């Protein structure tokens, strides 16, 4: 995971806090789902399409973390869930592990209103 985060930083997808990781999108505003990269840059959470070889593709969404509501981060035995709302749309992600520092950055930015 660290190599991928280093690549996200060096390629400019996320800032030097390294809050970037891949997850499975289970709910996005236009109905997309699948493998995405979540990258925090400043106070924005940018969502990028990612292929199965971890190649980052097009920018799908740019979300101002200061504008999100109903942030939920749940940790279970087998998986974690990240879910929030923005402008009336629900964003939901699962199938990510070992990203507690990145989730902490998301939570801090969301609470920094």
Question: For the regions a protein language model found, what residue spans apply to each?
Answer:
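Phosphoinositide-binding peripheral membrane targeting modules
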Residues: 28-37, 41-87
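Anionic N-terminal interaction surfaces
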Residues: 1-42
